[in-house]
């Protein structure tokens, strides 16, 4: 019986394998991607921007025309506006081989990881993004307006991990924040690995494209 148990364990070790790879984000943002010059008076640009932005999926939180400050926000799918790298998980066991490839900013992903010393784990990974944007309307000249979009990003990651051996789920939620053109990393895992997220400039470009 003892020899049979050892043989079974040896077979499992030989047949079970897993590896998780992480590629850091590659997005690069041009320094001027959050600024737009409009050849119209400031009041005219402001007056046309309010209804135009209201038609989009952004929420207008605050309007202060005398100071030229408008605050709008976005909440939803992070993959549209930030880059959190790429994740690949390879699993091999008695059920066969599986490979999961997905963007780190993907809103939801279910996958598996295999830890040689702990066994197979099922993961449900969810990402959410909140972007708060300050739009500043500045008069450069009588018929020229400079509009600057400064964003504060808050990315939230919620992970539920379930060990196949005991089927007991554990959930953790972590948030990071960074500004336009910046980046931040989630806390490192037990292996010292941490996922990084960077802004791509797409949110600022999309907002500024609506201002004419």
Regions found by a protein language model. Give the residues of each.
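C-terminal motif of bacterial Sec signal peptides marking the signal peptidase cleavage site
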Residues: 12-15
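Positively charged n-region of N-terminal signal peptides that target proteins for export
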Residues: 1-4
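Ser/Thr-rich, low-complexity intrinsically disordered terminal regions
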Residues: 17-212
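Residue-level signal for mature regions of secreted extracellular proteins and peptides
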Residues: 9-10, 77
């Amino acid at each position: 019986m003892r020899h049979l148990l050892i043989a079974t364990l040896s077979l499992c070790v030989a047949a079970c394998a897993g590896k998780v790879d992480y590629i850091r984000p590659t997005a690069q943002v041009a320094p001027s991607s959050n600024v737009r010059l409009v050849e119209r008076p400031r009041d005219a640009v402001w007056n046309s921007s309010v209804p135009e932005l209201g038609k989009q999926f952004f929420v207008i939180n605050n309007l202060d025309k005398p100071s030229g400050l408008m605050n709008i926000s976005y909440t939803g799918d992070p993959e549209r506006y930030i880059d959190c790298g790429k994740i690949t998980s390879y699993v091999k066991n008695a059920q066969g081989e599986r490979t999961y490839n997905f963007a780190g900013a993907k809103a939801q992903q279910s996958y598996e990881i295999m830890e040689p010393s702990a066994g197979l784990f099922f993961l449900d990974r969810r990402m959410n993004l909140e972007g708060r944007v300050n739009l500043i309307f500045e008069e450069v000249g009588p018929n020229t307006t400079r509009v600057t979009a400064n964003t504060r990003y808050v990315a939230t990651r919620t992970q539920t991990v379930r060990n196949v051996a005991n089927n007991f789920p554990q959930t953790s939620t972590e948030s990071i924040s960074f500004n336009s053109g910046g980046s931040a990393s989630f806390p490192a895992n037990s292996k010292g690995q941490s996922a990084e997220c960077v802004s791509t400039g797409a949110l600022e470009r999309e907002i500024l494209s609506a201002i004419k």
